[in-house]
């Protein structure tokens, strides 16, 4: 992409040298691959008036006397068919270089010479192509009367002493607004801290008489227009704007050398016709591509009396002849513009031959739209189309500016306005980011004042609401890349210059204690000391595994783009994964083992956070298994691990029996499981697994486990333990009772308040009402 510094200077006052400006652009905005120096390209080239024209017999040449602003006329031989007396033309004097050859290996320097052996010719009257302004060699360039006088330098009249930057497009992939001079200049203003002179048309739409416009659902249209627009999917085309104009001679080129022609040439484009030149010029200016249809052909293709425009995906096998004559076979991701469902354009890429503007065109349908960049990237690669328009669309042109650019095109073309339709089903709200001054300075390592931050952002179009140190940053419609705090912080750092940030280490305090990390470390050490092994399993599991464990599939989040059919759900418990690992371990020649895992789980009942992201809980899952054990129950085996671990954490717990109707504990056997309580708070579940679960996983009978909520455990830990300087007294206490375990434990704890009490066994003979409960008691002597 080529960017003219002179064009930038029309919108920004530049207080630095060109060299410094180019350096700033390169360091803060975009990679500059090269600079084309045109400061002397148009030296010794003047505006002149042709005073006398005489045809040279038997040739196509004319002998011309021209006024170059001096006392005497200068003679030039000219072969252009459009040379005539009284016209203002462009003269390249002897000794000057023809501009189109300036950058060639052998530039063409003019002199004074004899034509046909006797007619002296001093320099030449130049055509637009020879001036390097494009176009065909069909005559000499003509200057509009009143805009210059004989003797004026061409470079002064058209501001041609310029530096043209060659930009690396890839470094602007995320900035579609910078693919237009206005957006690029706005960024330059922000970098320099200067006011940006924004064109009024970006904010002021077409003016209509009162009641002329009608507002519908997601659309605006003029009363006198019968244009219909249907967009099949707003994600394919968030906005589609059309205007209908009657133009007397659409192919008429501007006979005078113009700023539009010169700017198109600087960007590497050629002049084609009045309408097309305006659309191309506005694309270079704003970054918004436009397209012009022959309206009468549009109706003829659709076989209707009114325009019925549909924006839709291509159907299998659809073909379309493009403006360049190539017939493309559409792919399913191509977006098509259709007239009564007949394709007339490959959206964002190129128009169709069947609606091409030509010398017969009387009515023009102008299009300004926003299309899905993802679809257009596929279109670009599939069909090998790399036009200026699709280059911009594939960067993500904002839907916010289509209508205003269309309105400016209507004004520039200056035809008879016949109607409009603006459809915007996918026009979203501006991005809003809440941030504080301290957050900005903390991440950048700076001490920027609030006022400087606000001014910097406002200079490039952001709206800022200030509440003390808090800033509400509202992104302008053209900044489709702003979503999070870091995006805003990056803008400030870039615009003010990363090179201006002092390389000083931040005076941050060391990271605070991570209590969860410390808790996990202690649990890991404790369980490993007791012979358990830590495992790490996938956070994603299958529906089959959920059902095998008896869990409610509806309470798990399903992953839309899962990496495998076996990994479609985010787990809501660690136990199913541990049961699966237990099966794998039981196949090995080991008599007994215990495994555990600490990780995050997600359940729909946990809800969403403020950003709409599922809330998670950190859990500890544990399973103990033995091939053969006749001396104790699996429940109490698991309970020993749990209580030894909790003892090291300084947590006392109670147990409440699980009722069979409680759905949260479907995988546990109700008669052999209990809820783990820390005071009034439930922190987990412990128990033996149901036969149905064991059978599903093909596991041995001696199997139990627990799962505790580490977030809840963290609130109850007490690492401070009294140091004992004496031996501890150990004894067993057996109580025969009809009461349940929880009631008996409460009575024992009341009798031995300072002791560490661990249940040992519970025995109840068949047919007996009483049971024997044995506790292991340790007290200080």
Regions found by a protein language model. Give the residues of each.
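Terminal amphipathic helices with adjacent charged low-complexity linkers/tails
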Residues: 192-208, 221-231, 416-440
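Extended, well-folded interaction surfaces typified by the phenylalanyl-tRNA synthetase beta subunit core
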Residues: 433-593, 778-781
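Glycine/proline-enriched, intrinsically flexible loops and inter-domain linkers
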Residues: 5, 55-57, 197-208, 218-318
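Mobile "lid/hinge" segments at catalytic clefts and subdomain interfaces of large enzymes
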Residues: 121-129, 139-141, 159-163, 305, ...
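A carboxyl-terminal module marker
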Residues: 2, 23, 27, 459-462, ...
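Conserved mixed alpha/beta core segments that line enzyme active sites in large multi-domain catalysts
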Residues: 47-76, 261-262, 273, 279-354
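Phosphate-backbone binding interfaces of nucleic-acid-interacting proteins
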Residues: 1-210, 218-221, 365, 384, ...
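Beta-rich nucleic-acid/ligand-interaction surfaces
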Residues: 39-43, 203, 282, 510-515, ...
């Amino acid at each position: 992409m080529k960017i003219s510094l002179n064009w930038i200077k029309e919108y920004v006052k530049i207080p630095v040298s060109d060299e410094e400006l180019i350096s700033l652009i390169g360091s803060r905005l975009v990679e500059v691959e090269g600079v084309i120096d045109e400061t002397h390209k148009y030296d010794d080239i003047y505006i002149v008036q042709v005073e006398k024209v005489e045809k040279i017999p038997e040739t196509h040449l004319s002998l011309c006397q021209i006024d170059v602003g001096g006392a005497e006329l200068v003679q030039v031989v000219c072969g252009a068919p459009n040379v005539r007396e009284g016209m203002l033309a462009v003269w390249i004097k002897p000794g000057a270089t023809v501009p189109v050859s300036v950058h060639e290996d052998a530039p063409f320097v003019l002199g004074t010479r004899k034509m046909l052996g006797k007619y002296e010719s001093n320099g030449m009257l130049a055509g637009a192509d020879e001036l390097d302004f494009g176009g065909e060699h069909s005559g000499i360039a003509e200057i509009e009367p009143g805009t210059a006088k004989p003797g004026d330098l061409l470079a002064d009249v058209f501001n041609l002493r310029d530096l043209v930057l060659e930009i690396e497009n890839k470094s602007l992939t995320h900035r579609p607004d910078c693919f237009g001079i206005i957006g690029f200049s706005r960024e330059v203003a922000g970098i320099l801290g200067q006011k940006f002179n924004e064109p009024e048309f970006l904010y002021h739409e077409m003016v209509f008489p009162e009641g002329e416009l009608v507002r519908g659902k997601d659309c605006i249209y003029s009363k006198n227009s019968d244009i219909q627009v249907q967009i099949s999917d707003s994600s394919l085309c968030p906005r589609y704007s059309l205007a209908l104009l009657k133009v007397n001679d659409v192919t008429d080129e501007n006979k005078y050398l113009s700023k539009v022609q010169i700017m198109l040439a600087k960007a590497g484009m050629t002049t084609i016709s009045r309408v097309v030149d305006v659309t191309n010029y506005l694309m270079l200016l704003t970054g918004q591509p436009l397209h012009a249809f022959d309206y009468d052909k549009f109706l003829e293709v659709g076989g209707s009396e009114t325009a019925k425009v549909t924006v839709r995906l291509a159907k299998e096998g659809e073909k379309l002849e493009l403006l360049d004559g190539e017939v493309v076979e559409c792919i399913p991701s191509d977006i098509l513009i259709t007239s009564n469902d007949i394709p007339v354009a490959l959206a964002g890429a190129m128009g169709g031959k069947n609606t091409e503007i030509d010398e017969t065109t009387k009515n023009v349908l102008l299009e300004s739209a926003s299309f899905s960049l993802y679809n257009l990237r596929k279109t670009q690669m599939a069909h090998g189309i790399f036009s200026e328009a699709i280059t911009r669309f594939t960067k993500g042109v904002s839907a916010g500016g289509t209508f205003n650019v269309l309105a400016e095109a209507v004004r520039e073309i200056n035809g008879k306005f016949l109607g409009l339709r603006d459809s915007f089903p996918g026009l979203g709200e501006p991005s809003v980011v809440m941030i504080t001054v301290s957050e900005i300075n903390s991440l950048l390592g700076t001490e920027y004042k609030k006022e400087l931050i606000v001014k910097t952002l406002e200079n490039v179009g952001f709206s800022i609401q200030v509440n003390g140190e808090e800033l509400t940053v509202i992104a302008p419609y053209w900044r489709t890349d702003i979503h999070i705090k870091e995006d805003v912080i990056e803008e400030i750092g870039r615009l003010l210059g990363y090179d201006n940030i002092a390389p000083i280490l931040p005076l941050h305090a060391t990271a605070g204690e991570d209590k969860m990390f410390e808790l996990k470390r202690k649990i890991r050490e404790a369980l490993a000391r007791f012979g358990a092994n830590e495992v790490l399993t996938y956070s994603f599991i299958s529906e089959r595994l959920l059902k095998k464990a008896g869990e409610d599939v509806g309470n798990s989040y399903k992953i839309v783009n899962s990496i495998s059919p076996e990994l479609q759900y985010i787990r809501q418990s660690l136990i199913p994964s541990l049961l699966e690992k237990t099966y794998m371990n039981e196949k090995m020649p080991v008599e007994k083992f215990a495994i555990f895992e600490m990780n995050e789980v997600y359940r729909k009942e946990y809800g969403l956070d403020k950003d709409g992201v599922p809330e998670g809980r950190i859990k500890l899952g544990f399973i103990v298994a033995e091939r053969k054990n006749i001396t104790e129950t699996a429940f109490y085996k698991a309970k020993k691990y749990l209580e030894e671990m909790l003892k090291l954490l300084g947590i006392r717990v109670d147990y409440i029996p699980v009722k069979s109707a409680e759905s949260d504990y479907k995988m546990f056997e109700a008669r052999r499981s209990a809820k783990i309580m820390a005071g009034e708070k439930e922190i987990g579940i412990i128990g033996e697994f149901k036969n149905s679960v064991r059978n599903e996983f093909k596991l041995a009978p001696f199997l139990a486990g627990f799962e505790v909520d580490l977030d809840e455990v963290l609130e109850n830990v007490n690492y401070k333990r009294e140091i004992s300087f004496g031996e501890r007294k150990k004894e067993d206490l057996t109580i025969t009772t009809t009461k349940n375990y929880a009631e008996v434990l409460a009575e024992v704890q009341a009798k031995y308040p300072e002791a560490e009490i661990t249940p040992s066994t519970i025995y109840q003979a068949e047919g007996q009402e009483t049971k024997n409960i044995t506790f292991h008691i340790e007290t200080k002597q």
